Amino acid sequence: MIFTDFLIVFDNLKATIKIIKLIRVRNPEEDYEKALKDIEDIIIKLKNNKDVSFLDINQKEPDLKEWSSNMTKEEFINIVNICKNYIENGDVIQVVPSQRFHKKIHTNPLNIYRALRYLNPSPYMYFLDFDNVKIIGSSPETLVKIQDDTVEIRPIAGTIKRGKTQEEDEELAKKLLSDEKEIAEHVMLVDLARNDIGAIAEPGSVYVDNMMHIEKFSHVIHIVSNVYGKKAKQHSIFEVIKHALPAGTLSGAPKVRAMQIIEELEPTKRNIYGGAVGYISLNQNIDFAIAIRTATILGNDLYVQAGAGIVADSIPEKEYLESLSKASSVMKAVSVAEASREL
């Protein structure tokens, strides 16, 4: 967690930039003048920034041979079958196993972020530079949000690729909403969200709005629901975050048993994958994204992780392909960035 007193906010809708400086007031007039000077310095840096590359967006699809995974296809399929056995035995209803992909990169990480913004625009876009570690993400999904004590979780479960025309999109959306497996999985995750909010909400305040509506993203169509509740006064915002983590869509149900199975089956720790990226404001509002469609960069090593929700009637081959599909946007962004040239 980082406490920052300086923000540069880019409004994508209005194409405007706001520079915000938090003033810790001791000498009001002097502190105000210093804040103005700091803002002016940032404006000069922004205007003089020439570190720009040309991105060739029309690059071919990523070559999977350039990527390695922490498990083979056969090992992933075996994990899916083990999860199905746990489900059949009544241990869990769903488990979300994942695999982690790795590639040596030879490009500026900022260009990967720029490419990802273009290829996979999402509600949550982030590039976090911690010197030795960089986090780049394009997440479609809210972990938890609080606005004026109203808590919101938006489960996303049920996915299908977009069509080439509006008519195809409509047909695919109908197909998605008629898929019994996808619907059952979504309803289960809505119930999880209700439970997560219910643990910290005022009694009787939890409700679902716009149940199972369709949302279209750049490459896929999702089924989405909105779950709300009024935060009880005795619970802090940190308790809200604690109850929301990890997201049911990244662990399974029941959460604790699903996480135990994931711990048993996955060969490496997840690190940021399935965690959260977001902010806490001084007025106690929060907004956190689930860390999916997210790359971690350590030096020249880039990692991206993706999984699939396993239920009783899951088809192992299909779930393996889903994990590849979910990682593909980051992989494509890397391909584009590596083909870029300096202007």
Q: What are the residue ranges of the model-derived segments?
A:
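Extended alpha-helical targeting/anchoring segments
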Residues: 1-343
